[in-house]
Amino acid sequence: IAGVFEIRDGASVAVRPERCWGCGQCVSVCPVDAIDHDAFPLEKCPLVDNGRQPTAEQLAILMRTRRSARTFAERPVPRDIVRDLVSVSRWGPSAQNSQDVDWVAIDDRARITEMSKATVDEIRRFSRLMRHPVLRGVLRLFLGRELTKSAGSNPRAGEELLDRWTRGLDPIFYNAPVVLVGHTRSRRAFARDDAIYDAYNLMLAAERQGLSTCQIG
């Protein structure tokens, strides 16, 4: 697609290497492993046995059975499993194959509780701003009409979250044993989309590991 290769004298030759955008497709499709890319060394690109791929029906079942859970067992998730999930997530599509989404895993209960309370406090603060007619108009300039309308649809959201918090509930992370935070460079094109795609890959992989998930934010 990028015009890097041309067929000359019956052979594929890299004639415009400067056009390479690092997608790895050339390494992927070569039937005889003749292309060894600096960014995709062959030893790190094992051949995939297509016979082991799930059928369309199996994949559809996985997608249908995945559910967003808000009740979790009080059982730690082994860190090697978390690492495997993060590793799988990067195979989600990304702009220019940047694979620029990084993950922070938090499994410390005190830290998760602190993050949950901070989120409740921030939502309460934002809810108060949305109830002020002048500030609501100013926020519309930054957030846009639709997002402002959505954010202001429940002006009591912050107080409702605080009420649940004071009753000993976790209205943000639902007492999950692990919180995974995906992040990428904010000014990069399609950064948010890339993070969402990676998150969904991770959630499907977690489902096959017997782990429930819920995407927050």
Where do the model's predicted regions map?
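Acidic, surface-exposed loops and disordered segments
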Residues: I1-G217
